[in-house]
Amino acid sequence: MIWDKSTIQLPDGRIEEATTPLIISASRRTDIPANYSVWFKKRLKEGYVGWKNPYNQKVSYVSFDKARLFVFWSKNPASFFPVLPALDERHLNYYFQFTLNDYELEGLEPFMPPLAKRVETFQRLSLRIGPEKVVWRFDPLFITGELSPEKLMQRVESLASQLSGYTRKLVFSFADISVYRKVERNLRNASIDYCEFTPELMNEAAQMLEIIGKKYNLELRSCCEAIDLRGYGIQPNKCIDDDLIRQLFSGDPELMNFIGGQETLFPGKDNSRYLKIKDKSQRNDCGCIASKDIGEYDTCPLGCTYCYANRVPGKTHPIGR
């Protein structure tokens, strides 16, 4: 997606070119709501953000001038509540991808608050902005020699019961360990006895998830998975989702013009509009539409052992610009 360009003035007076996206992802690369709420509020006030390419170290800029939607990704947005009024005052649309896992016994998320506190934050956010705007992610589904799919699904169901009425959708993925060598190395260094999901185990988990989804009235979606789980009522997800945007923000003409304001009369027959705005920079099995991510790799201090966005756990730097 080629977004429009504009110019911004930096504090030192320099004029720089900036991309002006309609949809902003904050962020697949780092947990901005958990760690950088003050930074984000300042950037929102300034109207732009700088982003450093991790490979060539070049800084590029993203302007918020035309932004109509922020999609936030977080495991613990407790400190982000003071930012919400600033978004509302600017009439900016937003929703959250809230990852709420239960790996306390395994220590896979060492710097997370206690699970009960995170559940409370989820419920509070849902009451503040509405359950349809807080998408629950149990992501990734992770198994070990001790944590079988059956035990894992017991944890998923426990959370589903606590989140009943506070969300409409459960999104999951199966841990991709061998795909990311740094993740494999980090798990090995942490002495985690991990197991890979085979197609048989994926189907076994999907069967149990189907039961949980029906019991707690949750839409089930898989994220970036090649395996077809539609037989269990599980559709491929679009985390940055034109259908959800259409449902939540139909009164925003700019968003509707971008995604197409009406659904196709015969779904699946004409998806030319979706294909035009699909984010081609993501993995093949990703269904997201185009957005601009404003996070930086190696800036999340939460230390999750399975994280792909930090090269070395515990060695991060603050997000800048």
Which residues make up each language-model segment?
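C-terminal/domain-terminus segments
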Residues: 228-240, 302-305, 311-321
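Local cysteine-cluster metal-coordination motifs and their immediate loop/turn environment
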Residues: 283-312
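A C-terminal junction/extension of Radical SAM enzymes
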Residues: 200-284
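Long, low-complexity, charged/polar intrinsically disordered accessory regions
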Residues: 254, 258-265, 296, 312-316, ...
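Conserved C-terminal portion of the radical SAM core fold
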Residues: 117-184, 208-225
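Active-site-proximal loop/turn and secondary-structure-junction residues that shape catalytic pockets
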Residues: 30, 76, 100-104, 140-142, ...
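Surface-exposed cleft-lining segments at the edges of enzyme active sites
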Residues: 104-112, 140-150, 188-198
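Conserved Radical SAM active-site core
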Residues: 1-109, 115-131, 311-321
